[in-house]
């Protein structure tokens, strides 16, 4: 029921968060948009939001009013996608082939997967031609070897239904691993705990899950 966003100004490796916020209670009474700018300005108001397209339109309208001449000024849009199955081990530019693979992974993430897809579809409709990139929570964990990701169940469940250990919160674990390596001066071995809306623990060796 929520879409979160951040607006970045990016130039030659430098980036700054101009604004961030969310549209909450999508499809429910009392839906609202909340925005916090980098200068401390905060904005919140109720607005009727029936679906993810309405939410993204509300975000683009607000950003166009406060930070952009128009939404077409955006150079690219990044999407956090929940599941990339075994297709993706890194972020990718979204095209028809990528979308087909994302649709194919929906049975692996039936609760949240459709919402991620709706976001891409809405942005494609509202900003046709703007580059879109998908980052997958499961991508970081594609380095896990088969003995570690295989469950002790009949092999056909993996071969036919793709039931295996995938790993999640990969973008968070990857970032934490990089920062830990910077602090300790080496990659090494780490146990990384992600504690947020969900929780997960990952063993990381030499920067890999």
Which ranges hold each PLM region?
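Glycine-rich phosphate-binding loop of actin/hexokinase-like ATP-binding domains
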Residues: 140-209
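A gly/proline- and charged-residue-enriched helix-loop-helix capping module
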Residues: 101-119, 123-126, 160-163, 167-174
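Conserved active-site and cofactor/substrate-binding residues in soluble primary-metabolism enzymes
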Residues: 50-54, 93, 97, 114-118, ...
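Short beta-strand-loop/turn "lid" adjacent to the catalytic site in phosphate-handling enzymes
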Residues: 63-112, 131-133, 140-148
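Non-transmembrane, aqueous-exposed alpha-helical and coiled segments at domain scale
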Residues: 71, 118-119, 127-129, 200
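Short glycine-rich, Thr/Ser-proximal phosphate-binding strand/loop in the N-terminal lobe
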Residues: 2-49
